[in-house]
Regions:
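Polar, surface-exposed loop/tail segments
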Residues: 1-25, 61, 71-78, 92-96
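Hydrophobic beta-strand positions in blades of beta-propellers and related beta-sheet-rich domains
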Residues: 50-52
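Active-site-proximal flexible loops/turns
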Residues: 38, 59, 63
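Low-complexity, glycine/alanine/valine/leucine- and proline-rich hydrophobic stretches
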Residues: 24-48
Length: 127
């Protein structure tokens, strides 16, 4: 086995801990990182971030709205959607994890997912 060989084309990064504004699903490739921040309450707006990691390893310049990165963000969104579909199929039924299928769906408007956030919060507090 080659320890320097690539193992995954993409990896999902998931944060479902802490304040709901910090909950996010991200996808990372060798060169790019895409994050969808779904929270849109308390003055926040749902937003996307895209970083070109090989050129910007500290993630200082968000390329999500840069027209030169339109193809890259579309590709990263496809990867994101595949990881979300996997989460939807495989999420455990406790602690509100299944509700994140709605929370992280970038095509669902906040008005239709705010209840899912409340559902997640109430289920995670019932331990």
């Amino acid at each position: 086995e080659d320890p320097t060989a690539d193992i995954h084309e993409t990896i999902a990064l998931i944060n479902v801990w802490g304040h709901p504004a910090t909950h996010a699903l991200a996808v990372v490739t060798k060169d790019m990182k895409y994050i969808h921040w779904p929270y849109a309450a308390e003055g926040f707006e749902a937003t996307d971030e895209l970083y070109h990691l090989s050129k910007d390893p500290h993630e200082l310049v968000n390329k999500a709205d840069n027209p030169e990165y339109a193809a890259a963000i579309n590709q990263m969104r496809q990867h994101y959607d595949k990881h979300l579909a996997n989460w939807t199929r495989e999420a455990v039924s406790y602690n509100g994890y299944q509700s994140y299928s709605t929370v992280f769906d970038r095509n669902v408007k906040w008005a239709n997912k705010s209840d899912a956030f409340l559902n997640v919060q109430s289920k995670s507090k019932k331990k």
